[in-house]
Amino acid sequence: FTFVCGDIADKDFVDDFFAKEKFDYVVNFAAETHVDRSITGPSIFVLTNIVGTHNLLEAARLNGVKRFHQVSTDEVYGDLGTDSTDLFREDTPIAPNCPYAASKASADLLVKSYFETYQMHVTNSRCSNNYGPYQFPEKLIPYFFRLISEGKPVPVYGDGLNVRDWLYVVDHCR
């Protein structure tokens, strides 16, 4: 495991890093992920989630990476509705309804295109909301914990009927 602070939207950085490190496998966790921020400022989502993923795919292809895994989101499927008994499946059509989901769906399609065009070994996981250690403070669970610990009210989104599925990050990795 190597942690390097860099911007995947910076093609020169990505190209140099891949050429130097000679990876066998790439797991792309990098993403802008906040739905509300994607509505007020979508450009960074396009840059990071689409252009950045393209930079990683191209560097992986040119440097002989054996497998590329894209970490995506169930947001690409859109909404089920509160009274739905349906479930999202791997073959559920994508129907993104916010800039974040559209940027992740676009990245997923790029990943698929690298399999179809270059026969690159790629996989993709579209998980529900992840939680776990080191989660960014703007995310729901750490955000709510902070508010509660400070004695502040916890916001209710919309009419309070939204349903979310949560997956512990270690379970996602399995």
PLM region spans:
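Conserved catalytic core of Hanks-type protein kinase domains
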Residues: 29, 147-148
